[in-house]
């Protein structure tokens, strides 16, 4: 049988990569209407990420650059670059249920959390482990999380994300699992901000995705924001 460490490592291997390039759609279900925002993302490890919004027209050309714990956003409307840091990285992106960190961070759980197995459960005819993860370091967006991990896919099909106090901040789930470059990976993530009473959730739908792609360092230069 797999040890807790084996499970976490397998999950990290599926979800993380040295780098990735992806196009994605964010579908934000508001109270009255639904918005769809398309973007292209370049991510290297945990420290470098660049996002460019492609549509709708109002958001097109907006860009985000993340270097470590710092984030810069560029808005073509104002032609200004603004720096965001610290707790602001936990704020909502474009009114969605996702934060900058949810979208742009690629950090292995193994490094960040101590895990313990709470049991097993069958969901929709598939076996899952239930695992509790507690932060090893301060300052994480989600100091505690509980994950339901599919025993075949080795992916957290459902997660509850908690504050240090134990308050439920968000729920996340994934579906549309398929093999991408030899790994199981979801086609869709669903995030729900549990602190927003009226939230109907945000879908993050993967388009084309390339893992371990070569991304030139110049992609992460601040000058790119205005180009």
Task: For the regions a language model picked out, list residue spans one by one.
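Gly/Pro-enriched, hydrophobic low-complexity segments
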Residues: 80-84, 101-104, 124-222
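Acidic/charged, solvent-exposed loop-and-adjacent secondary-structure segments enriched in E/D, K/R, S/T
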Residues: 75-105
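Solvent-exposed coil/turn segments that connect beta secondary-structure elements
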Residues: 27, 44-46, 54-56, 69-70, ...
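N-terminal mature ectodomain segment of secretory-pathway/periplasmic proteins
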Residues: 3-77
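Short structured motifs
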Residues: 6-9, 36-37, 113-119, 172-175, ...
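A short, amphipathic edge element
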Residues: 4, 34, 104-116, 166-171
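Long, terminal "pre-/pro-" and other extracytoplasmic accessory regions
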Residues: 30, 59, 109-126
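A short, sequence-level motif marking secondary-structure junctions
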Residues: 41-45, 67-68, 86-90, 175-178, ...
């Amino acid at each position: 049988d797999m040890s807790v460490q084996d499970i976490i490592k397998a999950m990290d291997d599926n979800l993380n990569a040295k780098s990735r390039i992806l196009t994605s759609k964010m579908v934000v279900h508001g109270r009255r209407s639904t918005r769809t925002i398309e973007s292209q993302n370049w991510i290297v490890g945990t420290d470098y990420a660049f996002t460019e919004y492609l549509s709708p027209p109002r958001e097109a050309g907006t860009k985000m650059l993340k270097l470590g714990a710092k984030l810069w956003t560029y808005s073509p409307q104002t032609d200004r670059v603004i720096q965001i840091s610290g707790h602001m990285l936990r704020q909502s992106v474009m009114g969605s249920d996702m934060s900058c960190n949810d979208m742009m961070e690629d950090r292995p759980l193994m490094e960040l959390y101590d895990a313990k197995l709470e049991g097993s459960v069958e969901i929709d005819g598939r076996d899952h482990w239930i695992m509790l993860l507690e932060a090893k370091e301060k300052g994480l967006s989600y100091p505690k999380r509980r994950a339901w991990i599919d025993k075949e896919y080795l992916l957290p099909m459902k997660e509850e994300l908690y504050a240090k106090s134990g308050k439920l901040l968000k729920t996340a789930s994934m579906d549309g699992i398929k093999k991408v470059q030899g790994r199981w990976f979801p086609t869709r993530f669903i995030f729900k901000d549990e602190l927003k009473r009226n939230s109907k959730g945000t879908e993050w739908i993967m388009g084309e995705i390339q893992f371990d792609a070569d991304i030139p360092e110049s992609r992460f230069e601040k000058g790119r924001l205005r180009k």
